[in-house]
Amino acid sequence: MTIHIYNTLTRQKEEFIPLEENKVKMYVCGPTVYNYIHIGNARPPMVFDTVRRYLEYKGYDVQYVSNFTDVDDKLIKAANELGEDVPTIADRFVEAYFEDVTALGCKHATVHPRVTENMDIIIEFIHELVNKGYAYESEGDVYFRTKEFEGYGKLSHQPIADLRHGARIEVGEKKQDPLDFALWKAAKEGEIFWESPWGQGRPGWHIECSAMARKYLGDTIDIHAGGQDLAFPHHENEIAQSEALTGKTFARYWMHNGYININNEKMSKSLGNFILVHDIIKQYDPQLIRFFMLSVHYRHPINFSEELLQSTNNGLERIKTAYGNLKHRMESSTDLTDHNEKWLADLEKFQTAFEEAMNDDFNTANAITELYNVANHANQYLLEEHTSTVVIEAYVKQLETLFDILGLELAQEELLDEEIEALIQKRIEARKNRDFALSDQIRDDLKDRNIILEDTAQGTRWKRG
């Protein structure tokens, strides 16, 4: 089964054929580290971590690069407001980023390059563009000359005339054409700066990714990915810079994830309806957040609401409960071989369907449907009077494998004695208040965690199942 990827560049699904057999070069645009990330910022790391995991599962050696923009207008503004220097703020939020995405199940990239650690290669990249006539200096700034690059607009599928009509030259900019964009910005008084052939300054945003992608992955990469909002102008400008310099295709497959809406309204800082990851993971299990994000195809928008999150949690718990029941039943199973082949054959069908979903542009929504199918099928098997260790182990292994591909964990942390006692007390209060629905819910939840309650004349006793 071959993998097909929807390529933003061609607007169609294409068979994935990497440049080098069994090797994948992948670049994902990382954050500007001036604040905590919100859930919209967190979608690309989760989506493309899952893509990476699946490629690795299929046997590819994935070289995965994701950068940090650690010098930028937003960072300088934050530094001025807080009375701190730019490196201090950047270091703080790089650490916060790692804490957040690690909690969400994302592996570290092969390399996490920072702009400030690669200034020499960025300056050299700009210098080469100037020498080739694709860039020009203007009073200490350096701009890319878009009219010199014939393919400008090919990623966003917009004619250059239309793009130019919507562009403008801002006050203080010294460029020749409204579509030209900054490669190097002359330092203003009091700003952090680096020495360059054009004077003191710092790089523009777009050049950073082109330079670092080239350094760590070469002139041509297999997959370049990021949020939908980056397609234009960021990724369009990356293509222009890189292909103008090398004369080679910059990236062969372009992948972009969709937006996140909050209660059916587009999430934005201007509307004040954004949710920070480090806040939401205090309220909800980070694994649930990831499962929720993957329950929708990565190119589609996601509507984020507490109601939908709770509904997703119910589904996730059903799978985890089936897994827990399988593990619990393993001890009492035998080497029974009757009917083994039938159940194992069904498991193979689920595995095939899961891979077919992932091969179809990494359709995690359909892949998760197969997780539900495995769990439901397992529950049916557990109704058998006699169960086989071989079949039980096959179910357990399959669930663990599929969850791992999606960056999810199945094991539940064992409840502490005091946590159990607190839940029992909450159940007692519910019964006193004749809230029998809550009482039953607590009992059932504890049962799912292998905690058995026994109501006696002396009170409620419990034991681990």
UniProtKB/Swiss-Prot annotation:
Organism of derivation: Bacillus thuringiensis (strain Al Hakam)
Protein name stated in the entry: Cysteine--tRNA ligase
Residue span of motif 'KMSKS' region: 266-270
Keywords assigned by UniProt, alphabetized: Aminoacyl-tRNA synthetase, ATP-binding, Cytoplasm, Ligase, Metal-binding, Nucleotide-binding, Phosphoprotein, Protein biosynthesis, Zinc
Residues where Phosphoserine is found: S270
Binding site for ATP: K269
InterPro entries assigned to the protein according to its UniProt record, in alphabetical order: Cys-tRNA-ligase, Cys-tRNA-synt_Ia_DALR, Cys-tRNA/MSH_ligase, Rossmann-like_a/b/a_fold, tRNA-synt_1_cat_dom, tRNAsynth_Ia_anticodon-bd
Biological-process GO terms, alphabetical: cysteinyl-tRNA aminoacylation
Catalytic activities: tRNA(Cys) + L-cysteine + ATP = L-cysteinyl-tRNA(Cys) + AMP + diphosphate
